[in-house]
A protein has these predicted regions:
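Glycine-rich P-loop/Walker A and Walker A-like loops and their local beta1-loop-alpha1 context
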Residues: 1-47, 118
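Residue-level preference for the first positions of well-ordered beta-strands
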Residues: 20-24, 104-106, 132-134
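Short acidic, S/G/P-rich loop/turn micro-motifs used as interaction or catalytic elements
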Residues: 30-33, 60-62, 110-116, 140-142
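Short amphipathic alpha-helical segments and helix-helix/interface helices
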Residues: 36, 40, 95-96, 120-127
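AAA+/P-loop NTPase substrate/partner-engagement loops
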Residues: 48-71
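Short glycine-rich substrate-engagement loop in P-loop NTPases that contacts/grips substrate
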Residues: 68-96
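Conserved P-loop NTPase "ATPase switch" module shared by AAA+ and STAND
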Residues: 99-117
Length: 174
């Protein structure tokens, strides 16, 4: 879809006060940057601007002190599950804090979340009623599956099925 068409649908959907509000925009890094720029110029139906996208990678790293981060990196290969749990907990706190403060958040740069296979299903519960999340996801559609980071050589990273409702998920034109 064209950027303007997606933005128009988002304008209507995010201002509905009840229901699930987890949205996904899928495209290349270039098309996501273009879309993000266009979305930042758009206003919601009440005239307020859409918020600027938030880098999840940067936000997660800020949850760790320098010492804790160094220890985590040094022990990651030996203890991958505790590292994954730390990232998952930091992601949960990050999302909850931003939703509480802003209500509507746009998330980009989710590479750490996918690299550590963080469970994304809590996003469905958190993004409801007055709390809304828009995910900017680098990926492509392959049959009925969304493949995240399709240029990654480490294998496929499918977006969990049923995470985002089909009518809340859009593929950007190139």
């Amino acid at each position: 879809m064209k950027d303007a068409e997606i933005i128009e649908v988002l304008r209507r959907k995010v201002d509905v006060p009840v229901g699930r509000h987890l949205y996904g925009i899928i495209g290349s890094y270039d098309s996501l940057n273009r879309f993000s720029s266009e979305l930042s110029k758009a206003t919601r139906t009440d005239g307020s601007p859409f918020p600027q996208p938030i880098s999840v990678n940067k936000g997660l790293l800020e949850f760790f002190s320098d010492t804790e981060f160094r220890t985590t990196v040094e022990t990651e290969a030996k203890y991958p599950q505790p590292t994954r749990k730390k990232i998952e907990d930091a992601f949960d706190r990050f999302i909850r804090n931003h939703l509480k403060e802003y209500g509507l958040i746009i998330l980009q740069d989710l590479e750490l979340v996918f690299a550590y296979n963080v469970n994304l299903n809590p996003l469905r519960t958190l993004a409801a009623d007055e709390r809304k999340i828009i995910l900017l996801l680098p990926g492509k559609r392959s049959d009925k599956t969304i493949i995240m980071y399709p240029h990654c050589t480490e294998g496929e990273n499918p977006l969990p099925t049923n995470l985002i409702a089909e009518d809340h998920l859009w593929l950007l034109d190139v």
